[in-house]
Amino acid sequence: MDDKHQQRNLVIVTILSALILFGWSFVTKHWLSTPPAPTQQGKNQPKAELTAEESGDKPLKPVDQVLQETPRLPILTESVEGSVNLKGLRLDDLTLIRHRETLAKNSPAVRLFSPAGTENAWFTSFGWTGENVALPNADSLWKADSDKLTADHPVNFYWNNQQGQIFRITLSVDHDYMFNATESVINRGNSPVIVQPYVLTNHQGVFKTASSWTLHTGPIGVFNGSVNYHVDFADIDKATNNSIRNNTQGGWIGFSDKYWLTALAPHNQKIAIDTDFRSSSNHHYQADFTVAPVVVAAGKTASTSVDVFAGAKEVRVLDRYRDQLHLPHFDKAIDWGWFAIIEKVFFYYLDWLFLHVGNYGLAIILMVFTIRALIFPIANKQYASMASMRRLQPKMQAVRERYKNDEARMRQELVTLYQKEKVNPFAGCLPMFIQFPIFIALYKTLLVTIESRHQPFILWIKDLSAPDPLTPFNLFGLLHFTPPHFLMIGVLPIILGITMWLQFRASPQQLEPAQQQIMSFLPLISVIFMAPLAAGLQVYYIFNNLISLAQMMWLQHRHSTPEERQDRAERKRPSKKKA
């Protein structure tokens, strides 16, 4: 293999990486995904039947209006703010103050939870099922022993059934996104009662970001030590009784959007729980779990502690909860995919660079320099092998001519020649294969991590996780029309195509005219392929191409013979026209 393949290798890397990325994701999703845990049937389920307002029988109302209809207790930390609904004791008002909806300066914070009766309603609540005992429900009014929930001040909520039992929920929240609820039943009656604690999260409709081969959104959980990505909202609708139940020891269950997550877990990961995904006819989806029934003797108190994550899927935060709270595979609430180890290495290095330089685009460029420096010894050997192959061309051609009627003998003699001259004809392929995991890892890192969301680079690039927004087909926004999808080719993909064309032109032109014509179209194909991908990925490949071009020119000079250098110099001289 010689330098004429350099440009083709880069295009092959891009195309094959895409095939691996989308094809392997399809295979793992449909054939290699974790099998569902056995479906369990039981009598006791969380009592979260929807009222007429919640079930969609009434017109939806603005969030601000609904928030004023019930008594509330404020929530305020450095990461979240909102309120607890004292009617039914629900977490149904929560915004993530570290994240904004859009890039606009006046953009509101991302709203995660909204009360029932509003658009995109999403809430979490706690409760009990039981026998021979009056239980709190969605209309019960709870009392609090404080006027605000903060990271430093938990709040106790009480409800008295006036029959001898007091229900208490102690709610706390940390400085990020983890709530803890201790559900207690204080039995002051004369006889024992049986209760079964539960926690649920309820979401109206499906997420805007649909689940795909490359990114799972929707129902998610860890059951008996295995992450389950295989359930979609549609699967719940099609299930028997619109319910998918699992019995598991520990684990967690919830709903995951691209960047946001609500997850429910027993604080004690050694206990058994019954989990359930279910839906109503009007597309309310619920994830919940119950623990084993508890007999509360007269004069005794029984308590169960549950954890509720409600927030952004920040990588370091999820990793910390996985380790500190022993939540199994909690970091995999981010759908890293099959190449998770490589992707997390990329993420942590990118994040480290970003913390030092303050610009995510610059961090990507520095990562390019790092990777090119690491593989430079391989590239050096590659070009040395290519130079040896070029010098060997006359002998190879002689072997082909001598044994042109005997393919087997010709291959044998060529192998003998390679061994004698100590040349590896496949040495030029290694850098190409190294770029496979790099492409896939960076693609997934920019796709699934919230840390790259809304990260600017320079000039018009305001979000490196999104495609380049400018296109020459509407004069970069001066013309008030949106080009069709196939014409949404931004400036960065065009620059990327130019750098690929420069690489092609800088390579020794030893191709046949027909081959050269075909190769000249490959940069255009890559432009079209890369256009809908994240701008950060395009920035990576632009600078990767430029550095690769500089390395290629230097290595060509270093490993070329005097005759080859003279030939290149003559080709650069302008030809003189005859008089």
UniProtKB/Swiss-Prot annotation:
One of its GO terms (cellular component) is plasma membrane. It is found in: Cell inner membrane. The chain crosses the membrane at residues 10-30, 330-350, 351-371, 423-443, 478-498, 523-543. Residues 35-61, 560-579 are annotated as: Disordered. One of its GO terms (biological process) is protein insertion into membrane. Pfam families: 60KD_IMP, YidC_periplas. GO terms for molecular function: membrane insertase activity. The keyword Transmembrane applies. NCBIfam families: PRK01318.1-4, yidC_nterm, yidC_oxa1_cterm. Interacts with the Sec translocase complex via SecD. Specifically interacts with transmembrane segments of nascent integral membrane proteins during membrane integration. Belongs to the OXA1/ALB3/YidC family. Type 1 subfamily. This is Membrane protein insertase YidC. It comes from Zymomonas mobilis subsp. mobilis (strain ATCC 31821 / ZM4 / CP4). The gene is yidC.
